[in-house]
């Protein structure tokens, strides 16, 4: 668990599914498109998988006053994704979530951490550059890669 100026960061647990679902439900269509590469409305079942079966991933949450304002998941292959509630963006929450995912990857012996995003997801690209990811830009997607080993 990590805390920074009113934000608590911790591994998600089974009781968090509703808060994560509410977080995703608060997102605009554009935000959902940036996160999933499609206009994808996440289901309760998909959210429950994030917090009930950790066999192939680890999910962490950012919490302020018992409200989940950010969620990040890293899979065992090193790929990760995250989302921060629109009202809490540009406060370092996304950056801190990625730093935590990098620590988790190191503990699991994952040598390469990566993200895929769309070219107009400037916040994610900015976080990647700030944290030392190599950024490869194509016209359809951006790949961020960080070698840990």
PLM regions and their residue ranges:
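C-terminal "cap" of GNAT-fold acetyltransferases
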Residues: 138-149
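A short, internal acetyl-CoA/4′-phosphopantetheine-binding micro-motif in the GNAT/acyltransferase core
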Residues: 81-90, 117-118, 149
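Conserved acetyl-CoA-binding loop-helix of GNAT-fold acetyltransferases
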Residues: 84, 90-107, 126-130
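Conserved acetyl-CoA-binding loop of GNAT-fold acetyltransferases
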Residues: 129-139
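Conserved GNAT acetyl-CoA-binding A-motif
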Residues: 104-118
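Acetyl-CoA-dependent GNAT
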Residues: 26-81
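A short beta-loop-alpha structural element at the N-terminal edge
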Residues: 7-22
